[in-house]
Amino acid sequence: MAPIRSRSRKVRIGTQMINEIIKKIEELSGQYSGYEIFSDWIKAAALCIDNLAGNYNQEIYRKREAQYMEIAKKHLGKMGDFADMTGMLTISLEDNMEDVLGKIYMQAGLGNKQTGQFFTPFHLSYLTAKIAVPEDVNEQTPYIMHEPSTGGGGMIIAAAKVLRDRGLNYQKCLKVVAQDLDWKGVYMTYVQLSLLGIEATVIQGDSLSGQDTAAEQIFYTPRKKGLII
């Protein structure tokens, strides 16, 4: 019975963290909408993780540092709240491996017809991943995953969870290239994959255009850089 109690406890903690983040978004809303608070929080988290993990292109480092400072000036006195929210996100991902940001986005009512952005319920992503991920994956023959419309990274997280549930170390058995036209989806994917230790290249752009990708449109997770956070 002990494993059942432990699993239940973890789900409760993960859910609690999600509820706390949604509450924090509502508290910070006022001058800016909840949608804008969410978007700026995720962007700030992505910029911070990327630069702290070591951005070896100094021009890109400076540009992302400037973007982060713009957010800090816009939300003066709130960056500590953003950091707390990132901490709660980390706890939720550790306790209940799923598309936490997609769930927050939908439960907070940020997805609507105006924005045109919705996120697939994670249980559906997981069922799809169970079919899609090959049975012969291992550290010597990792699963190479290309996600041309990543959203918040839900399908990638689902694939990682399938590997974990098979008793494999997904941090060594999964390599990802994820892309999305929407910057928010890029930031959401990058933050969650970084916190989960997934090796990934996350790109902003149209996967069907065939155009070259500029350096500032590419994010490498810490794991891709050889680090674990």
Please describe what each predicted stretch is.
Residues 1-13:
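N-terminal amphipathic/basic-hydrophobic helices that include classical n-h-c signal peptides
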Residues 2, 227-228:
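Peripheral peptide segments
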Residues 10-167:
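Class I S-adenosyl-L-methionine
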Residues 112-113, 175, 189:
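A generic, residue-level signal for flexible/boundary positions that often mark functional hotspots
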Residues 144, 173-175:
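Residues at the starts of beta-strands that form the adenosine-phosphate
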Residues 168-169, 182, 187-227:
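S-adenosyl-L-methionine
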Residues 176-180:
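Conserved SAM-binding motif I beta-strand of class I
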